[in-house]
Structure formats: C-alpha cells, structure tokens
Amino acid sequence: MKFEWDTAKATANISKHSVSFDEAATVFLDQLALSGPDPDHSAGESRYITFGVSSLGRLLAVSHTYRPGGVRVVSARRVTRLERKVYEEG
C-alpha cells in the first residue's frame, strides 16, 4: 500500500501529537486494526479513521482518505480511553 501526506502537516503533527506519519502508516499493518468513516471530519472529501497498533507498539488513531493508488494520511495521535476500549473490544 502506498502512503502520501503533506510534509508541512506531517511536521505539525509531530509537534502537536508526537506521532510521525511514517509511524502512523504502520498502523495499517496491524491485522486487528479497525477502520470506519469519519463523517465529522469529511467536509469536502470522505475521511476515515483507523485505530491500530504501530510498529512502535503505540495504539494510534489515524485520520486518512483514500486516493487513487494509496492512502493519504491527514493526522495521527494516540487514541483516547474510549477509542482504546473500542479497539480492545474489536
């Protein structure tokens, strides 16, 4: 799977959430990852949110959209307590 993102947004995401988009992309390798639509953040394009464990062992929430040939990462952060529960309950 090919990933893309805006480099300025990626830098800002590290400052704000301490999560790189390179790490965020590894969430999609988690066989237990959960994905669904994110209608609250879909103004102008359909966005999705995926909860999964990264290659660094952190449970992350990754906001993304699908583009021809791949996935565009929009933001990434650690999950909230409620999101952790959703992931753990599968």
Outline where the language-model segments fall.
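Ribonuclease/tRNase effector modules and their secretory precursors
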Residues: 1-90
